[in-house]
Design a protein with these regions (language model features):
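Glycine-rich tight-turn/loop motif centered on a GG-T
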Residues: 1-6, 23-27, 47-51, 193-194, ...
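Hydrophobic, small-residue-rich alpha-helical packing segments that form membrane-like cores
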Residues: 1-39
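Polyanionic/metal-chelating signatures
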Residues: 18-19, 33, 39-219, 230
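C-terminal cap of metal-dependent C-N hydrolases
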Residues: 207-214, 231-233, 282-328
Length: 336
C-alpha cells in the first residue's frame, strides 16, 4: 500500500488537499502518530486515527495506551483537531491454521502461506518447521500472543468449543502452539479460534470510552470479512457498558454514537433529534437489548464466507428520515 511507505511530508501534502475541501483524513499510524497533531495544527484539517486501545502490559511491540493517551491530551489541549478512535469491543480476529493471517509476520508462516493450501498440513507435521514456528511466535515480536486469550470457536469436536488453548495445552501436556496444531490437524485444519489481541482491560476501556476528543469506531467496515466483524459495537456499548456497567448516562452514550460522529464527518442535519433535521431514529428496548453472536455465512461469490452479527434482540424499529426501513434499506451518507 502506498500509504504504508509514504513520508510524513507526502502525508501532510495530502492532508492539505483534504483541508482545502473541508474533508476529513483517516489514518492507521500504529505508534507513529504524534506528528498528526502537528499536521492538524498547521493545516486545520480534522484527522482521526486508529486505534487508541489497551494492550497487555509488557508488550514491547506496542507503546502503552496511557502514553498514547497522554500524547493525545497534549495535542488536544493545544487545539489540534485530532480524534483517535476507541471501542468497547476486545480486538479479536478469527485464526485458522489453513490461512493463519495473524501469524504472517513470522518467517515460518510466510513460508507456509507460499504453499498451496493442500500442502500446508504436511508442513504442520514437520517437527523442524513446527519448532521454528513455535520459537518465532514466542519471540518479542509476537509478545501479544496470549494463549489463554485464544478460544476455540469452530471445530468438529463440540467439547472443545469455548476452551482456551492455554488450558487445553496443559491437559494435553503440550506447548500451546503444538496443541493448536494437533487439534487443527484432527479436522483437516477447519478449526477456527477467536484470538483476542487487546482492548480486554475493562478498567482501561472504561477510561477510554469517556476520554474527550475520541470517536467511537474502529469497525472493520466490511474488510477482512472472514476474520472479524465489529458490526455489533453499538449494541454492545449500550447493553453491556451503559446499561449493565453504567460507564455513562444513556443520553451521553447515544450522542457518542450519533451526534459526535455526524458532526465530525460533516453529516449535516443528522445525529441529533432537532427541528429541521432528518428523523433518523432507532427504537430499542434497552432492558432486553442483547448483542448478536457472530455466525459464519457462505454467501459470497464462489462460496466465500463472512462473519455477520444479525441476530440482535431489542431493536424494534429503524426509521430513516421518519420512514421505517427494511433490514437492508440503508445507503451511504456523504457530506455536502
Amino acid at each position: 500500500m502506498p500509504s504504508a511507505i509514504a513520508s510524513t511530508d507526502e502525508m501532510e501534502a495530502l492532508v492539505r488537499c483534504a483541508a482545502a475541501h473541508d474533508r476529513v483524513v483517516e489514518t492507521n499510524p500504529d505508534d507513529e502518530f504524534a506528528w498528526l497533531y502537528e499536521v492538524a495544527a498547521r493545516t486545520g484539517c480534522a484527522i482521526t486515527w486508529t486505534a487508541l486501545v489497551t494492550y497487555p502490559d509488557g508488550n514491547a511491540a506496542r507503546t502503552h495506551w496511557t502514553a498514547k493517551r497522554r500524547t493525545h491530551r497534549e495535542g488536544w489541549a493545544a487545539g489540534a483537531r485530532v480524534y483517535p478512535q476507541v471501542t468497547c469491543r476486545p480486538l479479536s480476529v478469527q485464526l485458522s491454521l489453513l490461512n493463519p493471517t495473524p501469524f504472517i509476520g513470522a518467517p515460518a508462516f510466510k513460508e507456509l502461506m507460499a504453499l498451496a493450501t493442500a500442502d500446508r498440513p504436511s508442513l504442520y507435521r514437520d517437527t523442524a518447521w513446527r519448532a521454528r514456528a513455535r520459537d518465532e511466535l514466542a519471540s518479542e515480536r509476537f509478545h501479544q500472543v496470549r494463549w489463554s486469550s485464544i478460544l476455540v470457536a469452530e471445530t468438529t469436536e463440540a467439547e472443545l468449543l469455548g476452551r482456551d488453548l492455554a488450558s487445553l495445552a496443559t491437559e494435553m501436556q503440550l506447548d500451546p502452539f503444538d496443541a493448536l496444531v494437533e487439534i487443527a490437524l484432527r479436522d483437516d485444519l477447519t478449526t477456527r479460534c477467536t484470538m483476542i489481541v487487546g482492548n480486554d482491560n475493562a478498567e482501561g476501556v472504561t477510561e477510554l470510552l469517556s476520554e474527550p476528543g475520541c470517536l467511537l469506531g474502529i469497525s472493520d467496515a466490511g474488510a477482512h470479512v472472514g476474520m472479524l466483524c465489529d458490526a455489533g459495537m453499538p449494541v454492545e456499548f449500550l447493553a453491556l457498558w451503559v446499561r449493565d456497567r453504567g460507564v455513562m448516562s444513556l443520553e451521553r452514550a447515544v450522542h457518542r454514537l450519533t451526534g459526535e460522529p455526524a458532526a465530525f464527518f460533516g453529516l449535516h442535519k443528522r445525529g441529533t433529534v432537532t427541528e429541521g433535521a432528518h428523523a433518523d431514529l432507532v427504537v430499542l428496548d434497552l432492558a432486553h437489548l442483547t448483542p448478536s453472536p457472530l455466525r459464519r455465512v457462505y454467501d459470497l461469490p464462489a462460496g466465500g464466507d463472512r462473519l455477520v452479527a444479525d441476530q440482535v434482540v431489542g431493536i424494534d424499529h429503524v426509521l430513516v428520515n421518519g420512514r421505517p426501513r427494511a433490514e437492508r434499506g440503508g445507503r451511504v451518507l456523504r457530506t455536502v
